[in-house]
Structure formats: structure tokens, C-alpha cells
Swiss-Prot record:
<keyword id="KW-1003">Cell membrane</keyword>
<dbReference type="InterPro" id="IPR003676">
    <property type="entry name" value="SAUR_fam"/>
</dbReference>
<feature type="region of interest" description="Disordered">
    <location>
        <begin position="20"/>
        <end position="40"/>
    </location>
</feature>
<dbReference type="GO" id="GO:0005737">
    <property type="term" value="C:cytoplasm"/>
</dbReference>
<keyword id="KW-0963">Cytoplasm</keyword>
<dbReference type="GO" id="GO:0005634">
    <property type="term" value="C:nucleus"/>
</dbReference>
<comment type="function">
    <text>May be involved in the regulation of ethylene receptor signaling. Promotes cell expansion and plant growth. Involved in the regulation of cell elongation.</text>
</comment>
<keyword id="KW-0341">Growth regulation</keyword>
<dbReference type="GO" id="GO:0005886">
    <property type="term" value="C:plasma membrane"/>
</dbReference>
<dbReference type="GO" id="GO:0009733">
    <property type="term" value="P:response to auxin"/>
</dbReference>
<dbReference type="Pfam" id="PF02519">
    <property type="entry name" value="Auxin_inducible"/>
</dbReference>
<keyword id="KW-0472">Membrane</keyword>
<keyword id="KW-0936">Ethylene signaling pathway</keyword>
<dbReference type="GO" id="GO:0009873">
    <property type="term" value="P:ethylene-activated signaling pathway"/>
</dbReference>
<keyword id="KW-0539">Nucleus</keyword>
<comment type="similarity">
    <text>Belongs to the ARG7 family.</text>
</comment>
<keyword id="KW-0217">Developmental protein</keyword>
């Protein structure tokens, strides 16, 4: 049980860090385009790629900007999920965490990126 509690404490710590630099004063919340079976990024590119997430292989259609993001690349590399024959990507990550990742990428400000937390996030997101 101590191992699970330790992971939970680390996850809370990482989420606090993310929330501290993702909150921007005097800005309305960003609108996202999430649906139950797919999540389309708010990035400008219209080139969508299929991503299968988790044990249930839930289908998401995300922009190439999301797929090319370093955090997404790290997560896919850890899971060995990049590049199948049909161009789809498999990520063995919990669906809720993947949706949080999409939210973070859609709401992140490029000037506020924190590379030191990328590795912590990948460690928690990978199953």
C-alpha cells in the first residue's frame, strides 16, 4: 500500500506544479473539443491522426501538432506505440490521464514550458 500512496503523492505534486503554471490571470477558460469517442485538438492543423489509448484501445483523433509535441512523443516512445502500418498510434496510458494530457497541450502557453516536469509526467502517464 505504501507504494501506491507514494505514487499518489507524486501525482498530486506534479498536478500542483502544472496547475501553478497553467493558470493565467484575466483570461477566460479555453474551449476544448472533447467528445466521448474522440478528442480533436484546438491546434490550428487539420491533419488528424488516430491514437488508441489504454487497454480498451479507446479511439482519439488528434492533430499532428499534438502528435509532434515532445510530451506526446516521450509517452509514445515509452510505450513503443508509434507508427503502425495504418498510421495509427497506440498509447498504453489511462484514458483519464490521456484526456488530461490533451487538455494540458491545448491550454499550455509555449513561454511557460517546463522541461523538467516532462519526464515526471511521462513516468506517471505510462501504464
Amino acid at each position: 500500500m505504501a507504494k501506491g500512496g507514494n505514487k499518489l503523492m507524486k501525482l498530486k505534486s506534479v498536478l500542483k506544479k502544472l496547475n501553478s503554471f497553467n493558470t493565467k490571470p484575466n483570461q477566460p477558460p479555453a474551449q476544448t473539443n472533447h467528445s466521448r469517442s474522440s478528442a480533436v485538438s484546438a491546434f490550428p492543423s487539420e491533419d488528424l491522426q488516430t491514437v488508441y489509448v489504454g487497454r480498451t484501445r479507446r479511439t482519439y483523433h488528434v492533430s499532428s501538432d499534438v502528435v509532434s509535441h515532445p510530451l506526446f512523443q516521450q509517452l509514445a516512445a515509452v510505450d513503443g506505440g508509434c507508427g503502425s502500418e495504418d498510421g495509427s498510434i497506440s498509447v498504453s496510458c489511462e484514458v483519464v490521464l490521456f484526456e488530461h494530457l490533451l487538455w494540458m497541450l491545448e491550454n499550455a502557453d509555449a513561454d511557460e514550458s517546463r522541461p523538467e516536469s516532462v519526464y515526471e509526467l511521462v513516468e506517471f502517464y505510462a501504464c
